[in-house]
Structure formats: C-alpha cells, structure tokens
C-alpha cells in the first residue's frame, strides 16, 4: 500500500493500522462529545453532513502523515544500527590481526629455543665416558621409569585438556563469528583487570612465582621488540596458517624424537635412556603450548582459541618435575657429566616454561576479551530470540483478535457447512432408498399382476374327469371330447367343496373324479346340471387345506380390453394348472351351442369373448381379472380353419344364478309356451305365399304347431302366425325366441309379441305361467 513519501507497506498491515488509528480517534471524540453534551440543530443537518465528510477526509490524511513519520523514524534507526555494526566489525578485525601476529611470534621463539636445548644435551651426553654410563645404567633405568610415569600422567591430563579445548561447540562457533563485531573501547579496562586476576591466581606456588617474575623482565622486552615486525607482516589466510602450524609441529617431532640410527648398539641403549628424559621436556613444552594455544588440522578449530587457565594439578606436576630435576643434579654431579647436562636441560626447560607462563598470562587477557565478546554475542542472540518470540506473540495476538471479532460468523459458517454435509448425506441415502424401493415396487407390481393371481387361482381350479358309459348312443369320438375338463371351487364349507363346471364335461355320469393341484384325487358327485346354460355343479369332500375357495367378482362391470388370466387343464391331468393371459375381446356375445352334437344348434349362450389360449380340457376353467377374482367360466371356443383365439366364457353373475338352483333343486325350470316354430329365413317362396308374409319381413319365426291348452294356445297364438318382435326385441330365429323366453324364468311375467296374421300386423300377450 503506497502512503506517500516512497513508503510501501502491505495492504493488510495498512488496514489494520488505519483501523486502530480511527478507533482511537473515535473513542477520543466520543469522550469529548459526552463531556460537552452539545445539541445539534436540525436545520443545519446538511452542513453537518458536509463537515462530517470533510472530517473523515482529514482523518485519513492525519493517519497517513502519522504512519509515514513512523516509518521514516524506523528507517533512520535501522541505518544507525548498520553503521554501528560496521564500525565494530572493523575494530574487531584489527584486534584479531594484532593478537594473531603476537601468538605466531611467541611460538617461533619457543621452537628455536627447543632446538638449541636439544642439540646441546645430545652433544654433551655423547662426550661422557662409557664406563661411567654403564655404572649408572641401573639408576638411570629406575629414574627413567619414574619419569615415564610422571610424563604419562601429565600426558593424560594434557590430552584431556586438549580434548576439551579441541571439541568445537556451538557457543565457541558463535563466539568466533561474532567476536569481531562486539569489541569496543570499554572492554580494554576489563581485560586489564582480568589479566591481573588470572596471573595472580595462576602463580600461587612460591617457587614458580619467583622464577616467573625474574624471567618476565627478560622476555617482555623481546616481545615488545618484535611487535614492529609483527605489525609489518601481511595477514595470512586460514589455510596458510594451518599449513604453517603443521610444518612447525612436524619439525618439533623430528628434533625431539629422532636421533642417529647409525650409532653403535651400546650407544643406542643410552639414547633410549636419554629419550625417557627428553620427552618429558617436550611434554612440558607441549603442555604449555596446549594450555596457551591449541593448533589443530581441523579447520573448524580456530587458531586463536585460547586455553583454559592452569589447574592446581598442573602446577603440582610442574613442581614435582622441578624438584626431581634438582634432585638429579645433586645425585649425578659427582659421577657423570651426562647428568650435569641433563640438569642443565631441565633448568632450561624450566626457563621455557616460565616464558610460556608469561605468554600464557597475555593470552589469558585475550581469553578475557573473548569471554566478554561472547557475553555480548550471547546478549545479541538473546535479543534476537526475544524479537522472534515477540513476532510469534504478535501473530498469536492477531489470531486472537480476529477470532474475538469474527467468532460468531465463523461458528455460523462452520454450522452451515456441517448442515449442508449432513443434508447431502441424508438426501443421498433417501434417493438411494427410493430407487431401491422403486425397483422393489416394480418387481412386486410385476409379480402381483402376472403371478400372484395365477398362483392363487391354481389352488382353486381342479380337473374333472368322467367315464363315458359303454351303452352310450353317442359316437365315441364325440363323447371322448367331454371326458376331461376343468372345474372351479366356488364355495367351501368345512371339508365340503362345491365345484362348477360345464354340463358337457360331466356328461351323463353322476360320479366324477376330481384331481387337485397337488395331484391328490377324490370322487365327486354331480348335484345338478343344465344343458341350456351348459353348467353343472359337483360336490366333493376333501380335508386338503391347500385347496382354496376362489374369490367372486362382478361381470356387470367388465371393460373391453381388460386383462384376464385363464387357468385350466388342457389335454388332461398331464398339463393341469396351465395359465394363459389375454384380454376381454368382446362383451354381450350370443353364441349358438350344439349340445347334443347333432350338427344343429340348440341354444344361444350369453357370453363375453376372450383372446387367451383355450384348448380342449379348458372347458369349465376359471377366467380371473387383474384382482384375481372370478369373472367367468370357460364354455366354448370356435374351432374353424383360419380362426384363432376366439373363446367364450359365461359371465359369473349368470353362473351364480344357475348354480344356486342346481345346488338346491338339481335342475333349472324354464317356461314352456307349447309351440313349435320355423325360421323365416329357411322358408321357400311357396311357404311364404301360404302364410301371406309381406316381402319386407326378412327375419322372425312362423308358428308351425300349437299345443292344446298350452300357454301359447291360451295366449291366442295360432298356426301360421309370424312373430317378428318379442318383449320389444327384434326376433331373428327360434334360438333367439327360446333365449328371450328363458330369460324370464324367474319372474314368469307375460311378454308382448308383434305378429303377422293373414298379412296383417297385430300384437298379443304371451303368458309364461
């Protein structure tokens, strides 16, 4: 966000600061308004609005000015800190170079002194008498053994100190890195006090203290003389310094431990004895160097790392070595010159130790400076850590403020998300269940319409068989067609079954074989039959619970095209329980039936037409609707060439009327008017002229014979009368005349007939009782 004067800050930070600034100003304004309690006049509302808008603009300007001044002050502070850090870095670099050159000069002087002492000892030792050497060999071995123990103990202590000093730590690394930037002039006084304190603590031994004080006057001027040379030298890089130190250490080892390999065997023994003393001298020097400054090939170890101050054990060890050296000088002064040289070497090693101690005091001052710089660096690191923690605290405070400001909205948002997820899961499960239910409903509906009704109906349909009597006058081929048929259990009373079938199925036999769907059979008795309706009732007894009574429907409510099922036993028992499906093809059909098989129709059967497959053996079978209720009984089919699926069933309402009388009476009483008739369609021209029939009359019947004292005779009918209408219905032939008369079998009321007599039309009432 650009706020002017080349200051750019993040937009979120700008908004946050602006919000805080405005909040503080608004709070102050509210306090002032609360104190003043000034009333605002309604007439000056427009002016007040303009002033408010102007105040808001001024408020933004004040915020930008305050923010820009704050950022400028922060930039100035940053630049001042950078300048101070660069200045401190330069001071530390110069101090580092000065200390580095001083340390190198001291190490060079020590190396040169070591080489001179070792050459002197060797030359004097080899000039001594061989006999004196042999006489003192045993004593030398004892003393050398003691010296080895002392030197080994001292080496262990030195190695432990070296291990501690050479181990790099994170604090040392930070001290070496940040020491250059933390030196200031104020540290010089502290370094001086530290040097005095360390020198006083490190020289508690009276003997060593006197020697050190006596030698300081000799060594310090030499170091001061070499300061000019050190300052004139060019600073070395870190790899060059490491290489130089490695070469110096190799030279020391070569000068200290190598002697002539071409000497005689007896001299080699003395050299070995001498080597037990020379390593002690070198060990003293190495320990002093190890205390002062550790040089390691590892580049991680800094060459300027100062050692720790001498411990009490080191000082005691030095005192023991000093006492032993004096003891050797007193014991060997009268025997051999070798021991004198050895005491001289020991004395010089003591001087070297004193010089090293003096140098050690100076290095302790450097150590004090290093510790001071380390403390400063630690303070800086602590301040950085505190800044980081403060930043983290700021972030946490921002998050807390954000949560406190918007937690209701966040909770509502989370609740909405959870609610959406739950509702989605619920709706998915509901839709899945709905799809499953739809599939199940579809399967159940399919089973209900096609199979359930069929399975229930099969339990109510039986096979009816009769045996034609041997003396039957009917031809065998015609009688054989009626030997096997079907029946329907329309009523069940306990173990008693009432079965309806066709009259032409039972024939003239009183007993019938009834076979159920489970292949069990019983013998049934014919209660009654009616050839004009082609119906019969058979009574049977069975305790089989699998046989069920069929449900009765209503044939007056049939609909054209209504689906139906036909259940029967075509061709006998082998194919019992056959189910065929179809529809109602026609209603109110009048089907001529030839009962006695004389090729002459005997009766018009009132039926409805179906297109389901019907075969011989289906006669008397059940026709059920989509609800599984009985709506008709199969009665006939048309068996003609090129004619298919034209079958007929007697409506169940007509069946109920017939079977009721057959159960009680065993027969049906029809009215008989006592006449014989001929169809007009069958008359020839002479017969038409004889009865004086008008030419327009094409259909009707001619009375051919009237019984004396019959209903027709009582009604006034005479031979030669032509009947064209009966009971208000057009009369086609004698089958229709019988059908109309039989339809009034229950009421037996008189009916009106329209006749032609002697060519004249007239009406008469025909009595039915």
UniProtKB/Swiss-Prot annotation:
Keywords: Cell membrane, Hydrolase, Membrane, Protease, Serine protease, Transmembrane, Transmembrane helix. Residues 126-137, 247-262, 331-347, 365-390 have a biased composition (Polar residues). Residues 680-733 form the PDZ domain. The keyword Protease applies. Residues 21-64, 71-108, 138-186, 264-296, 310-330, 348-364 have a biased composition (Basic and acidic residues). The active site is at 504 (charge relay system), 534 (charge relay system), 619 (charge relay system). GO terms for molecular function: serine-type endopeptidase activity. The keyword Transmembrane helix applies. Residues 1-20 have a biased composition (Basic residues). It is a single-pass membrane protein. It is found in: Cell membrane. Residues 1-390 are annotated as: Disordered. GO terms for biological process: proteolysis. Its EC number is 3.4.21.-. It comes from the Bacteria. One of its GO terms (cellular component) is plasma membrane. The chain crosses the membrane at residues 410-430. Pfam families: PDZ_2 (PF13180), Trypsin_2 (PF13365). Its main location: membrane. Belongs to the peptidase S1C family. This is Serine protease HtrA-like. It comes from Staphylococcus aureus (strain USA300).
